[in-house]
A protein has these predicted regions:
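Phosphate- and other anionic-substrate recognition elements at nucleic-acid/protein interfaces
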Residues: 1-5, 9-132
Length: 132
């Protein structure tokens, strides 16, 4: 299983995905709860790889994760350029707009909730695509 992490200062997006690209969990947590949540997810889903974005806080998060998890879990960083914009588009695929929102062009729609968990999914997908 692979855990995706979109690290941030205030909140972090997390997703757990099978190698078959089936999403088994996705959530957004406060940054101060991220390490304990990752530890729980690693035990619950037998995570062997963490894929995280390479944004501004990634170095700090990398060291936090490595110092709080067993060495058997690999941690890799991946380019997260444009991942938030891509996650907004993915949000509308996962939750098609209703009512008035249907006539608003997709580029003008803003999801009604954070998309950090979807970014975490996209980071895993980017990682898996890098092998094809």
């Amino acid at each position: 299983m692979i855990l995706g992490l979109d690290p941030g200062r205030d909140k972090c997006g997390l997703a757990v995905m099978k190698q078959t690209k089936q999403i088994v969990a996705r959530l957004i947590v406060d940054s101060n709860q991220t390490i304990s949540t990752i530890q729980r997810l690693c035990q619950e889903y037998n995570i062997d790889l963490i894929v995280m974005g390479n944004g501004t806080t990634s170095k700090d998060w990398y060291y936090k994760i490595k110092s709080n998890l067993t060495s058997e879990i690999s941690v890799v960083t991946i380019n997260e350029s444009n991942s938030t914009l891509e996650a907004r588009d993915r949000y509308w695929l996962m939750h098609p707009p209703q009512g008035f929102q249907r006539i608003v062009p997709q580029g003008f729609r803003i999801p009604p909730c954070p998309v950090d968990d979807i970014v975490a999914i996209l980071l895993i997908e980017r990682y898996l695509r890098s092998f094809n």
